[in-house]
Amino acid sequence: MRAQWPGQLWAALLALGALAGVVVGESNICTTRGVNSCQQCLAVSPVCAWCSDETLSQGSPRCNLKENLLKDNCAPESIEFPVSEAQILEARPLSSKGSGSSAQITQVSPQRIALRLRPDDSKIFSLQVRQVEDYPVDIYYLMDLSFSMKDDLSSIQTLGTKLASQMRKLTSNLRIGFGAFVDKPVSPYMYISPPQAIKNPCYNMKNACLPMFGYKHVLTLTDQVSRFNEEVKKQSVSRNRDAPEGGFDAIMQATVCDEKIGWRNDASHLLVFTTDAKTHIALDGRLAGIVLPNDGHCHIGTDNHYSASTTMDYPSLGLMTEKLSQKNINLIFAVTENVVSLYQNYSELIPGTTVGVLSDDSSNVLQLIVDAYGKIRSKVELEVRDLPEELSLSFNATCLNNEVIPGLKSCVGLKIGDTVSFSIEAKVRGCPQEKEQSFTIKPVGFKDSLTVQVTFDCDCACQAFAQPSSPRCNNGNGTFECGVCRCDQGWLGSMCECSEEDYRPSQQEECSPKEGQPICSQRGECLCGQCVCHSSDFGKITGKYCECDDFSCVRYKGEMCSGHGQCNCGDCVCDSDWTGYYCNCTTRTDTCMSTNGLLCSGRGNCECGSCVCVQPGSYGDTCEKCPTCPDACSFKKECVECKKFNRGTLHEENTCSRYCRDDIEQVKELTDTGKNAVNCTYKNEDDCVVRFQYYEDTSGRAVLYVVEEPECPKGPDILVVLLSVMGAILLIGLATLLIWKLLITIHDRKEFAKFEEERARAKWDTANNPLYKEATSTFTNITYRGT
């Protein structure tokens, strides 16, 4: 396996390559910009240095590479070459548990860092984040009490007890609260006719309803879960006139009224928003003549109702996002199927937000909250606050298995107690007017953060010893600073010896790089043998011969350097995370990261922040859709094995959470969910057939529907096996006996037939018994001659 290089090493190599490119070309950038002061020299490039030594040999440029200045015998102590640096100011170690006091719980390290950056330079620093165990949790349940949620209200009357029981498996310090909303109590959102409809909006439905209200805070966060149940039982529904609700008003007030709600500083904040309808957004208030924008402040009165409901417009998504981030609140949209796609879109615009599908009667809200909390705790995503305009940041994430993922500022699939780290490169563009600024980096939903104090090192130390009206500058015509004269208005020359009023045509040849070329590039005047560049409405003209400017670079979509870089003498110098001739190609890869944890789902290449699908049949923003791909089922099969059965390659490598981010739902049977569904079947290690379906809805939510029970071959019946074995033994014995008997019979028959055959062939003489011998015997005497 190829070794992974740390993000810092990659960044360092890239930086060295960039700096080398500055000097390897045809000319030295430090000596070709026509600078005449130390401050200008440092702004040319991070590789440039300035020599303030008065004894520097004549003709040697004071702005040069440091090694060149040393070769020119510039004293080392006279060289101005500030180096960007990072210094850790505070770094408490990360905590392992969250059961201590707030001051003892640390989830982000370091906490404070100081950066010193010279113009156009960058510095890399690291940040570690850990989700500690047993961290306190605050859950505020915000419910839609419009008439359509009547059955849901009865379903959550015991939610407090059940929720506490489930959440205490994850934390020993839980508090829950309750609030309700309907919509702004003003026409056209409410019924105003007939008059009795104001007090009882359900007058024509033979039901009694509460008068319509905007938002009311019912129960402050408490660890007494029985009180939650009691307060919920006291609630009744109301009724509004139009379909959308005023939920965003309620979210805003529940977020910013931290004292009323009781949010703790040292706890995870979960705001559960339940509804079955759309919601009004900013500018919808104009339907009721409400034009005052939402101010994002707390307006809960002594009666615990939202007092500005009829005078202030609904909040915008941007304002909600800002306030949720400031208060470290994770929003959970628990909404019904008919509006889930809308709230899925909202969640993409609000960091730290999750969406769950609520059943029609809210019976699954308990599991939904627990699952949503698990998703929140399994993800770490960084956000940046108050970043100076002149700074740009680029991120590299080291999540699981110490794998560095360039361009990513989030990690998913984490377990409680896991530690992740981020390598962050801060790069400054130019020289900001404010020399000291600060910004904050924090994980979404965390109270812990990293404060970065930045000092922009734009000045030279030798400027502190400047001599105004110095005799060295032609009897006081300028300030002697850093080894050169900075001439007063109206004076020019290296020693301020030439007045602008003087004019000698013979000096004009010194204002042209070559004979025959325009003087001062036709963008300046030659005074005393020195180019004085014109001012321009488009930008700044610089250079020894006025050959450079900051406005003549290429444009892309109407913006110079695509809006992602600076123009430096006709060339685009791209910001961090951007590259290309036009600076229009981002180097970030987080936009190419698919839900399975792979860049472009492993089916394409990430080019300029977008996936270019290369596998035939694949499509989608991250090449995630590919019904005809051979890996559509094989990869998801590994996720099913890992997440449902806790086995398989991904489980053994502990990468299940990273590569398998789809929701898994168990079903009894697979149904036809449309053309975006892919049915898959495989045999597991137990030789059982597992069937599942991969489905992606219109909102982009991917789900794996897995049949609860795999189809396994039935095991043998023991009794049948025993009887079969015994029967087989008996049959074999009987068969053996029969065969033996048959063989014996055949053998006997053959012998008997042989006997009969031999007996039939026998020829016996029946006249004499060959065994009988007569009593007399007759012998003939051969010698007897008859005499």
From Swiss-Prot:
It is a single-pass type I membrane protein. InterPro entries: EGF_extracell (IPR013111), I-EGF_1 (IPR040622), Integrin_beta_N (IPR033760), Integrin_bsu (IPR015812), Integrin_bsu_cyt_dom (IPR014836), Integrin_bsu_tail (IPR012896), Integrin_bsu_tail_dom_sf (IPR036349), Integrin_bsu_VWA (IPR002369). The modification Phosphothreonine is found at residues 766, 778. It holds the Pfam family EGF_integrin. Coiled coil: none annotated. Residues 26-717 are extracellular. A motif (LIR) lies at residues 776-782. One of its GO terms (cellular component) is integrin alphav-beta3 complex. Residues 29-75 form the PSI domain. Mg(2+) binds at residues 146, 148, 245. Its main location: membrane. Residues 741-787 are cytoplasmic. Residues 462-497, 498-547, 548-584, 585-624 form the I-EGF domain. Heterodimer of an alpha and a beta subunit. Beta-3 (ITGB3) associates with either alpha-IIB (ITGA2B) or alpha-V (ITGAV). Interacts with FLNB and COMP. Interacts with PDIA6 following platelet stimulation. Interacts with SYK; upon activation by ITGB3 promotes platelet adhesion. Interacts with MYO10. Interacts with DAB2. Interacts with FERMT2. Integrin ITGAV:ITGB3 interacts with FBLN5 (via N-terminus). Interacts with EMP2; regulates the levels of the heterodimer ITGA5:ITGB3 integrin expression on the plasma membrane. ITGAV:ITGB3 interacts with CCN3. This is Integrin beta-3.
